A protein has these predicted regions:
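Short, surface-exposed terminal/edge motifs of secreted or surface/virion proteins that either
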Residues: 1, 19-30, 63-74, 98-129
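A detector of repeated loop/turn-to-beta-strand junctions in beta-rich toroidal repeat architectures
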Residues: 139, 155-160, 172, 182, ...
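Small-residue hinge/turn detector
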Residues: 14-16, 40, 58-60
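Glycine-centered tight turns/hairpins at beta-strand boundaries that repeat
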Residues: 138-155, 166, 190-205, 216, ...
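Extracellular/surface-exposed low-complexity repeats and stalk/linker segments enriched in Gly/Pro
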Residues: 2-7, 46-57, 76-103, 124-130
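Beta-propeller and closely related beta-sheet repeat lectin domains
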Residues: 133, 140-143, 183-187, 234-238, ...
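A short beta-strand motif characteristic of beta-propeller blades
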Residues: 172-177, 221-227, 274-280, 323-332, ...
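Beta-propeller blade signature
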Residues: 159-167, 209-217, 262-270, 312-320, ...
Length: 441
């Protein structure tokens, strides 16, 4: 083979550096495997770059240094608002400050409290209606459903649903009826409905398993929507979470000895479905007060039909799990087995109402610590036998009750959450009664 040594670029020629020790201009179209890291200086002409906004192209800024119009359909991890056809839920659990747009209503929300399971979404601009957790305390009305007018109880049952306003001292009004006259029922509350369940009706100890509901925002009769796990009554110990009603401690069956039970059961307050078992109390019991926080139910002051008849423990159980209740603390007194009262709840304390011959006690205990209750005042009338308990944002209420035959009461008492002291009589029920289901809205 002949090798031509020359500074002329051509086929079969050996390249000789020019007078500046540089390779003369040559065609590099066949060069391969050339690393881009070898280029450290100089510029690349725009014409040599395959630019555009389609697949495989290099994106080039326009004359105003802006990215040209292109599709962002496949972009990920880009911060921005959530767009949905519905409002955010309290268990969305975003980061604080997250923005949510309801593209159906046009409402815009910002998460201002990211507490897990209890988010608060604040409506912006001209929009109305924040999204926030439901709280047990009502702001409008207290309800009393059913009850008995006198002894013997079983021939004097009521089906009346009474309602009284928290904002005034007016008497209650009749707003509807239960599907059947009954007493010794349990009351529960939700954002839209109040509930009455269990108890017994005319004709002896005819225990029921009905769960009835009635609308908070209207005046209408109750409807039978579901069943408890078994027939039961003699419980005023109802508690309510944002989604469920809880019933703790009852007497069972339609035949003696009507034993107290340890069962805690729950039913949905947002859909119509039968109750399910939710665990056990620490101590089997019936009668007593029911109290609620956002996360736990409490029972206070109980009765038994065997020694010891008088039980002063406060029990606590979790809404989120079906573990056995804890013996949390004690009330100031252990009263007779027919002293059961409906309880009240502020956001920080439970209020238990106790009565009997010569006894009229209001106990207060903290939800946050295992501290025994303190006696903070008296009811306006000493009474017992299953009064209705209610809670507003500022007051607890105790209504109805019994002081011995034939003295069934119609009194509605109010107890301040802000200042310890005696209850004030603020109105009357439409019918004097005892052992009714209390609720609030």
């Amino acid at each position: 083979m002949t090798v031509n040594v020359t500074d002329t670029v051509g086929a079969n020629n050996t390249i000789v550096l020019d007078g500046n020790s540089k390779i003369p201009a040559i065609d590099g179209s066949q060069v391969t495997a050339l690393s881009a890291t070898a280029f450290t200086t100089g510029t690349l002409a725009t014409a040599r770059i395959d630019v555009g906004t389609t697949a495989g192209k290099v994106l080039q800024l326009d004359g105003s240094a802006r990215i040209p119009a292109l599709s962002g359909a496949n972009l990920t991890n880009v911060p921005g608002p959530t767009s949905s056809t519905s409002d955010p839920a309290i268990d969305t659990n975003p980061t604080l400050g997250k923005k949510w747009i309801n593209k159906t209503s046009g409402e815009v929300y910002i998460c201002t409290d990211a507490t897990a399971g209890a988010n608060v979404w604040t409506n912006l601009g001209a929009g109305t209606g924040d999204v926030q957790p439901w709280t047990y305390q009502g702001s409008n009305y207290g309800y009393n459903a059913g009850g008995a007018r006198q002894n013997p109880d079983h021939g004097n049952c009521l089906n009346t649903i009474d309602r009284f306003a928290f904002a005034s001292t007016a008497n209650a009004v009749d707003v509807g009826d239960l599907t059947v006259a009954q007493f010794n029922t349990v009351g529960n509350s939700s954002a839209s409905y109040s509930f009455s369940s269990g108890g017994y009706s005319t004709g002896g100890y005819n225990y029921q398993n009905k769960i009835e509901k009635y609308a908070n925002a209207s005046t209408a009769n109750a409807t039978d929507i579901a069943n408890l796990t078994e027939n039961k009554g003699d419980s005023t110990m109802g508690s309510s979470s944002p989604t469920h009603g809880f019933i703790a401690g009852v007497r069972l069956g339609n035949t003696a000895p009507y034993n107290p039970d340890v069962t805690i059961e729950k039913f949905s307050t947002v859909s119509d479905a039968n109750a399910v078992d939710h665990g056990d109390l620490h101590t089997a019991t019936w009668y007593g007060g029911g109290h609620s926080t956002v996360t736990h139910g409490f029972t206070s002051g109980h009765s038994n039909n065997a020694s010891p008849y008088y039980i002063n423990n406060i029990q606590r159980y979790a809404f989120a799990s079906n573990t056995t209740a804890t013996d949390w603390a004690n009330t100031t007194i252990a009263t007779n087995p027919y002293s059961g009262q409906g309880g009240s709840s502020s956001t920080t304390n439970g209020y238990a109402y106790f009565g009997g011959t010569g006894v009229s006690v209001i106990d207060k205990f903290p939800f946050a610590s295992q501290t025994n209750a303190s006696d903070i005042g008296d009811l306006s009338v000493h009474r017992w036998y299953g009064t209705g308990g209610h809670s507003s944002t500022t007051y607890g209420y105790s209504s109805g009750g019994w002081t011995g035959n034939p003295n069934v009461q119609n009194v509605i008492d109010k107890v301040s959450f802000a200042t310890d002291g005696n209850a004030t009589d603020v109105g009357d029920l439409t019918v004097a009664r005892k052992q009714q289901a209390g609720a609030n809205y």
